[in-house]
From Swiss-Prot:
InterPro entries: Kinase-pyrophosphorylase, PPDK_reg. It comes from the Bacteria. It catalyses: N(tele)-phospho-L-histidyl/L-threonyl-[pyruvate, phosphate dikinase] + ADP = N(tele)-phospho-L-histidyl/O-phospho-L-threonyl-[pyruvate, phosphate dikinase] + AMP + H(+); N(tele)-phospho-L-histidyl/O-phospho-L-threonyl-[pyruvate, phosphate dikinase] + phosphate + H(+) = N(tele)-phospho-L-histidyl/L-threonyl-[pyruvate, phosphate dikinase] + diphosphate. The keyword Nucleotide-binding applies. Bifunctional serine/threonine kinase and phosphorylase involved in the regulation of the pyruvate, phosphate dikinase (PPDK) by catalyzing its phosphorylation/dephosphorylation. It comes from Nitrobacter winogradskyi (strain ATCC 25391 / DSM 10237 / CIP 104748 / NCIMB 11846 / Nb-255). Belongs to the pyruvate, phosphate/water dikinase regulatory protein family. PDRP subfamily. This is Putative pyruvate, phosphate dikinase regulatory protein. ADP binds at residues 154-161. Its EC number is 2.7.11.32, 2.7.4.27. NCBIfam families: PRK05339.1. GO terms for molecular function: ADP binding; ATP binding; phosphotransferase activity, phosphate group as acceptor; protein serine/threonine kinase activity.
Length: 280
């Protein structure tokens, strides 16, 4: 954005790691300018010439400031050269700092991509996700469902809790809410805007088998006939599917899926949704 031409500008953040360093620095600087709104374009994991081609094409389509953290010298040099050709200001955020350290310490860098994130980002993201997930297991604390990344719903024994924990271990805040016959779903579940809601389903035969094993493991006595009755379970499944269609929830059949496979499918849905919501 040239001086006096407007208050919005394109900001391209190119990283060979997560991009978190660039985002933090650029937002800290932008905050010093009242009324200025950057249109962020974040390109993580750029480590090859082919990946850089896509980045350069987008920079040329929407010129602006280019900030980068690239340890691969050839990729960084090419990015800087092309930015100069199209009159886009560019700056390596880590480069000057590394030069200062190298001059003072008299030592070479390890060149390890993303080393600064080994503990802080990944570790604390997982801890936060696990804390959230444990607090929001089995329909607890529905008042803060909006803070989730993913909300899993489903009838009993559709692997909601183990899948939630698996996702949380990968840094995804996950809540789960049971769909119980005769009990209305929480109103908060009907108005969610941020989280991806995924309805987990399984074949009635599979649910009956898992539920029978569960009753045996806890030594349950009489009074659980409806829980494993074929007609009742089939009606549960049909009701859950109807709810999913009504509320436009994503649906996933977990009948023959392991926890890992279910989690992977959910993460793909989550990634696809984020791409669709990304502004052009």
């Amino acid at each position: 954005m040239a001086p006096g031409t407007g208050r919005d500008f394109h900001l391209h953040l190119v990283s060979d790691s997560t991009g978190e360093t660039l985002i933090t620095v650029s937002r800290a600087v932008t905050a010093q300018y009242a009324g200025v709104t950057p249109i962020e374009h974040v390109y993580p994991l750029v480590r090859s010439e082919k990946q850089l081609d896509r980045v350069l094409a987008e920079i040329e389509e929407a010129p602006g400031i280019v900030l980068f953290t690239l340890l691969e010298k050839d990729v960084a040099v090419r990015l800087e050269a092309r930015c100069q050709e199209i009159n886009c200001p560019s700056l390596s955020i880590i480069g000057p700092v590394m030069q200062l350290f190298q001059a003072y310490l008299g030592a070479d860098t390890t060149g390890r991509v993303g080393a600064q994130h080994t503990l802080n980002a990944d570790y604390f993201k997982r801890i936060d996700a696990l804390n959230y997930t444990m607090m929001h297991d089995d329909g607890q604390h529905v008042e803060s469902l909006e803070e989730a990344d993913v909300v899993l719903v489903g009838v009993s024994r559709t692997s909601k809790t183990p899948t939630s924990v698996y996702l949380a271990n990968r840094g995804t805040r996950t809540a789960n809410v049971p769909l119980v016959p005769g009990i209305a779903i929480p109103r908060q579940l009907e108005t969610l805007k941020n989280p991806l809601v995924v309805s987990l389903h399984a074949a009635p035969e599979r649910l009956i088998q898992v539920r029978q094993n569960r009753l045996l493991s806890i030594g349950a006595g009489p009074g659980n006939e409806a829980y494993i009755d074929r007609q009742s379970v089939t009606e549960e499944v049909i009701h859950a599917r109807r709810l999913s269609v009504k509320h436009d929830w994503a649906q996933l059949d977990v009948t023959r899926r392991s926890i890992e496979e279910t989690a992977a499918a959910i993460m793909k849905l989550f990634a696809d949704r984020r791409r669709q919501r990304r502004p052009d």
